Amino acid sequence: LYSGVGNTGHTYIPAMLQHSGLEVDMASTVVALSVLVEAPFIFYSYLFMDKISMKKLLYICLGIIFLQYSVYALDLGLISKIGMTLLSKHVTGMVLIMVTLKIVASLVDEKFLVTAIALVQTSRSLGTILIQNLAGHFLDNWGYEGMNLFLAAVICLVCLLALFLKLPERKGNQLFG
């Protein structure tokens, strides 16, 4: 579900920024710059990915995504939308990919790791199809604010479901170190 929200953002955020008054070229520039913001998180992932528990990392990312879509839903102005896009759009997506790798690696035997990751990616794609279709319905009927409120609500649901997620913490498993 969280991948569906993130991928829906990839689809609709540039159009939302344009709808909020930003020129198309500037909206594209904002999205391009948000990709560059994620680079330090990739290069320095070894500093935090193996030191923070999987559940904490998951909740941190989900909290940032919830904040992002809440700001979009509340329509606090173009500057706030640009700021949230720059600070969170790609960063949370990349960290969630790393968290997913860490979770799968901790739950599955190494010889089944590729198959398990393929299954995760398949379910992420199916979640994206579901969420994007629902988000499109909300956008058509209630505009960008309604769609973003729906996406924030989906993240709340994911947070509730994550409460029941049992994740082992493997000591000595330095996936990113």
List each language-model region with its residue ranges:
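Helix-loop boundary and gating motifs at the non-cytosolic
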Residues: 2-30, 97
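A late C-terminal transmembrane helix in Major Facilitator Superfamily
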Residues: 114-141
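A membrane-interface helix-boundary motif in multi-pass transporters
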Residues: 137-156
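Structural signature of the two symmetry-related core transmembrane helices
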Residues: 56-71
